[in-house]
Amino acid sequence: MLPEGVEELVLWQDEDKEREEAKSSLPAVKVDNMLTRWLRPHQREGVSFLYECVMGLRGFEGAGCILADDMGLGKTLQAIALMWTLLNTSIEEDQKPTVKKVVIVCPTSLVANWDAECIKWLKGKVKTTPICGDSRADAESAVKMFLAPQSRSQVLIVSYETFRIYHERFTTESSCQLVICDEAHRLKNGETLTNQALAKMACKRRIMLSGTPMQNHLDEFYSMVSFCNPGILGTTKEFAKKYERPILAGREPYATDAELAKANERNEMLSVIVNKFILRRTNTILSKHLPPKVIEIVCCKTTPLQRSIYEHLLSEKARIAQKTGKQMDVLACITALKKLCNHPKLIFDAIREKKYAGKTDGGNAIDDNLTPYFHGLYDGGGSGRGGRAGGQMCEGGEWHGGKFAVLARLLHQL
């Protein structure tokens, strides 16, 4: 039962004249009312867009799409609404569900969140398998169970790093009929092992979710589009010749009128193709529903635990660089320090994930020598449903990070 004023969301209707005359038209494809009741207008539009793309109804070669809405516009809910619809409806005469198996690939820190969102919106009606244990044996067992012919599990939720380990299990059409990649800007480099592993999937229905605006790097744009709809922009060389070089030439300060005209022409040609399967909305569409945004910057002191780990990271990297003579991976160090400044558990999770994936870093990433700092703090779980790769937060863990401590005090006042 829908609230007053909310209409059903119909994604497809049978327009076959012969079946209509024979009064044997196929049932319309509708989004379940338990989800429709919560969808805002822009989300209804988004679900329709996703459905038309993966079902080949938008007039382009492929079955993938990119939903690039700003953060806060409900990309997760839109994806779940589509997923549930495909698991339960069909446009074929046999009326067998369009998809039987779904794989959701996301950063490690979002595995538990995706599982919780599926449970929240679908009220436990879908059987999910979140891979968030801290041992390879657990992951091996979960993947095997998900792929078993008699398995009741419909949705596998897995981190990018873990999927890369088991990607060869998903090269058949029966293993997965829909893949959803969250934080999909991670696939902007087509040369990475993660991108290559995902590209080997037999599944052609590929949804990419990213709240990060696409930059002006055409090679990165090409990589994302090519994963989404392989071959739609040609080979790398063909894309460079037809689009990249002319467009970049037109951006040069001293570009001629002819180069500018050609750049605009190729830009328009490219837009005509990609706008069929890329949808981006900004959060300005919510402005009429929300009060004006007020931003206040609060400076938070680090905790003793954060300071100790911070000093360790700096001294350890300097020591390794001096000992080996190798240049430090500055970006990796900065990333680790940024994580630490948010909360020490992010460092703990990174150590666990690296160990679990069997990585060795050569001193350029977060090292195992940090483990003693976390003794007894976050290892209370992590293998259960809804846990995370690095264990669960201990009681009082919010006081281990300066930002979290300030947030905890604010919430207490509220």
Region locations from a protein language model:
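A short helix-loop-helix "switch/interaction" segment in the helical subdomain of ASCE P-loop NTPases
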Residues: T256-E265, I295-K301
